[in-house]
A protein has these predicted regions:
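Extracytoplasmic gating/loop element in the C-terminal half of outer-membrane beta-barrel translocons
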Residues: 9-28, 80-177, 181-182
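Repeated loop/turn-to-beta-strand initiation elements of outer-membrane beta-barrel proteins
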Residues: 70-74, 171-172
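Membrane-embedded beta-strand positions in outer-membrane beta-barrel channels/transporters
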Residues: 61-63, 161-165, 209
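Acidic carboxylate motifs that coordinate Ca2+ or other divalent cations, activating on Asp/Glu
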Residues: 35, 39, 43
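Membrane-embedded beta-strand positions of outer-membrane beta-barrel proteins
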Residues: 75, 183-185
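Transmembrane beta-strands of outer-membrane beta-barrel pores
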Residues: 68-70, 79-83, 161, 168, ...
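Short sequence motifs at beta-strands and strand-loop junctions characteristic
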Residues: 52-57, 149-158, 209
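Predominantly the C-terminal beta-signal and adjacent terminal strand-loop region
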Residues: 192, 196-209
Length: 209
């Protein structure tokens, strides 16, 4: 990804005064970008290629099957690694990709709950996400631009499906005229281990999920 390199959030007016910034003057709680070429301003020349693509370079799976004394268990694990997920789909030129995470700083659109709950505010000065703004007004519209702030390692491991069953002994079933009886419970997507915020499906982190 070609993005700006983020350096956390601005935490004071003094920090803003002594930093380079992009576009209009930022506010406390906005994302701070690094001036990579040292020219005293943040522009397209400060973008650099960082991280990996958004498709796993490595995918893997594991199927387990076991049986004992009438009980049987099967499970399917899937996973992916060596890829990055961007929590924003807004590019440096303002073009919006088709992801729900794009919409956090767009007027009339929704923001993910994790972002709202952890955004910088006066009441929450230690917030880990930038302050929320109305539409694209002021520097807040720049917080959604593609930068390392929004890149996350997409690796994950998921229990895709599991089934637990029990087959009743024939000696129990024959007297009631039943040849074979098996009961089971089954589940899908039972748990996922990943470093992404809650609500993002690492298999397809897009607008349709």
């Amino acid at each position: 990804s070609v993005v700006w390199v983020a350096d956390g959030l601005f935490r004071s007016e003094e920090e803003i005064d002594n930093s380079a910034w992009y576009g209009t003057r930022p506010n406390v709680g906005d994302i701070k970008y690094r001036d990579l070429n040292g020219d005293g301003k943040i522009d397209e020349d400060d973008r650099t290629r960082v991280g990996r693509g958004n498709r796993p370079e490595l995918t893997y799976g594991l199927n387990l099957n076991c049986a004992w004394n009438g009980f049987d268990l099967s499970a399917q694990f899937t996973g992916g690694a060596l890829f990055d997920v961007s929590l924003t789909g807004t590019y440096y030129n303002g073009y919006d990709d088709n992801t729900v995470w794009t919409q956090a700083f767009k007027e009339g659109a929704n923001s993910p709950l994790y972002l709202v709950q952890n955004a910088y505010t006066v009441e929450n000065p230690n917030g880990t996400f930038p302050r929320l703004t109305l539409g694209n007004q002021g520097h807040g519209g720049d917080n959604g631009l593609a930068s390392t702030f929004w890149l996350r390692n997409g690796r994950y491991l998921r229990l895709k499906s599991a089934q637990l069953g029990y087959t009743f002994p024939k000696r129990w079933m024959s007297p009631v005229g039943i040849q074979n009886l098996r009961i089971y419970v089954e589940g899908s997507n039972l748990f996922t281990i990943s470093g992404l915020p809650d609500g993002i499906d690492p298999e397809s982190p897009g607008v349709n999920n």
